[in-house]
């Protein structure tokens, strides 16, 4: 199987950020989904990740983030909106033909 792009959500958090670092260290192409531009998202860009911005509760933003990725690492905090965010992510990933998803729980 080819080494396609991996989308990491929650990429500016502790778990997502560590995941981005490990994937990049293994030579994978990484698209990091962040909520906003800040020092943490800038650092991910400097490490070599493609950083995109969006809100989990915006289906169109999630659709754009998953376009062209092979696999995804879904990391969403336990807080209000998790059910809707998970549903949007699953829908967008299915529509985009994402091969596999790891769900951090």
Please provide the spans of the model-predicted regions.
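N-terminal Rossmann NAD(P)H-binding glycine-rich loop of SDR-like oxidoreductase domains
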Residues: 2-28
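N-terminal Rossmann-fold cofactor-binding loop
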Residues: 33-38, 54-57
């Amino acid at each position: 199987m080819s080494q396609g792009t991996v989308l990491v959500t929650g990429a500016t958090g502790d778990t997502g950020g560590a995941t981005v670092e490990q994937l990049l260290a293994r030579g994978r192409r990484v698209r990091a989904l962040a909520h906003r531009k800040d020092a943490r998202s800038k650092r991910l860009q400097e490490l070599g990740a493609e950083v995109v911005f969006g809100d989990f509760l915006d289906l169109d933003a999630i659709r754009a983030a998953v376009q062209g990725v092979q696999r995804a690492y879904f990391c969403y905090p336990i807080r209000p909106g998790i059910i809707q965010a998970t549903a949007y992510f699953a829908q967008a990933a299915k529509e985009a033909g994402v091969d596999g998803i790891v769900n951090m729980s």
